C-alpha cells in the first residue's frame, strides 16, 4: 500500500517549494488569494499541485481554514501571518478553488487547524489559548463542515480552548469528537508532535531542551494523541518517527484498547488511499 507523502505548501510565508527552486519564491499567501479571481486561485493551485506531484507529494497540509480574528475580535496570529482566507463568505470560493486545483493535480488537501486557530500568539513555542465561547468555536467549525466532502484530512490545533477544556485540542477527546462528527471517515491528523510546546505540556514543564526528551514522556505523548482519537501522527524528527512506530506496534499487541484505536485509524487511512486512487488493487 503506497505511503501518504505530505508537505505544507500554503504559499506566502509557508512555502516549501522555494527551497527546491527560486522559481517558486513569492507565491501568493492565502490573504493575497482572497482578492484573486477564483479561476486564478484554481490555476495557481493546479500549477503548484503539478510540482508537488512531480516530487512525489500526494498530500498537501493546506489550506488553512482558520478565522482572521482572535477570540477578542482582533487580528489573529494566522491573519497577521497572512495565512487566513478570511471570513466564511470570502473564504469558501477561494478555498474550493484551491482544493480543486490540488485535486486536479492528484494531490489531496488538509483542512487546518481544527476547530479554528483563533488565538493571537504562536503555539509552536508555548501553548496558545483561546477564550472564545462554545458558540464562536462552533461558528468557526462551519468552514470545516463546508468542506467535509472535499477535504479528507483534518489537522488538529495545538491551541487550548479554555471554555471547552484546559487541554490542547490535539490532546482532547471532546474536540476530536467534534471533528469526527463532521464525517466519521475523515482522517484526523496531529500537529507536529515534536513541537516544543506540545512536548512541554506533556512533561508538565515550561520548556524542553533540544532532542534530549525523556523516553517516558515521549511514550506518554504517543498514548495521549492516540486515545484522544487522532488517526495520523505528524513528527518532524525522523528518528523519533521510527521509535513511535515501534511503540505503537508494542501497544497494539499488548493492550486491546490501543489495538482497537490503531485498527480504526488504519481503516480510515486505507479507505482514504483507496478512494483517492493512491492505492489501486491489481
Task: Give the ranges of each region predicted by the language model.
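Divalent metal-coordination and catalytic microenvironments
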Residues: 8, 52, 154, 191, ...
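Aromatic- and acidic-residue-enriched segments that line the glycan-binding/catalytic groove
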Residues: 15-28, 71-76, 129-132, 208
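Glycine-rich, aromatic-flanked loop segments that form ligand/cofactor-binding clefts
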Residues: 1-25, 45-69, 91-116
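Second-shell residues forming the walls of enzyme active-site clefts
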Residues: 93-257
Amino acid at each position: 500500500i503506497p505511503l501518504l507523502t505530505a508537505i505544507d505548501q500554503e504559499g506566502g510565508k509557508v512555502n516549501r517549494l522555494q527551497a527546491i527552486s527560486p522559481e517558486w519564491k513569492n507565491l501568493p499567501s492565502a490573504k493575497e488569494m482572497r482578492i484573486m479571481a477564483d479561476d486564478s486561485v484554481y490555476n495557481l493551485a493546479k500549477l503548484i499541485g503539478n510540482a508537488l506531484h512531480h516530487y512525489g507529494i500526494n498530500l498537501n497540509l493546506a489550506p488553512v481554514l482558520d478565522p482572521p480574528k482572535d477570540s477578542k475580535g482582533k487580528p489573529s496570529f494566522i491573519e497577521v501571518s497572512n495565512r487566513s482566507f478570511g471570513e466564511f463568505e470570502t473564504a469558501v470560493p477561494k478555498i474550493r478553488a484551491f482544493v480543486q486545483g490540488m485535486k486536479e493535480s492528484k494531490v489531496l488537501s488538509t483542512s487546518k487547524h481544527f476547530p479554528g486557530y483563533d488565538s493571537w500568539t504562536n503555539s509552536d513555542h508555548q501553548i496558545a489559548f483561546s477564550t472564545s465561547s462554545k458558540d464562536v468555536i462552533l461558528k468557526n467549525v462551519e468552514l470545516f463542515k463546508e468542506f467535509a466532502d472535499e477535504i479528507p484530512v483534518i489537522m488538529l490545533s495545538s491551541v487550548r480552548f479554555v471554555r471547552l477544556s484546559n487541554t490542547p485540542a490535539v490532546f482532547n477527546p471532546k474536540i476530536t469528537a467534534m471533528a469526527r462528527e463532521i464525517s466519521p471517515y475523515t482522517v484526523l491528523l496531529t500537529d507536529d508532535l515534536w513541537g516544543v510546546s506540545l512536548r512541554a505540556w506533556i512533561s508538565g514543564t515550561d520548556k524542553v531542551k533540544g532532542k534530549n526528551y525523556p523516553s517516558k514522556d515521549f511514550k506518554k505523548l504517543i498514548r495521549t494523541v492516540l486515545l484522544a482519537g487522532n488517526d495520523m501522527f505528524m513528527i518532524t524528527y525522523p528518528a523519533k518517527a521510527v521509535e513511535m512506530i515501534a511503540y505503537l506496534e508494542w501497544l497494539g499487541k499488548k493492550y486491546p484498547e490501543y489495538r482497537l484505536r490503531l485498527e480504526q485509524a488504519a481503516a480510515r487511512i486505507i479507505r482514504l488511499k483507496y478512494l483517492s486512487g493512491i492505492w489501486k488493487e491489481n
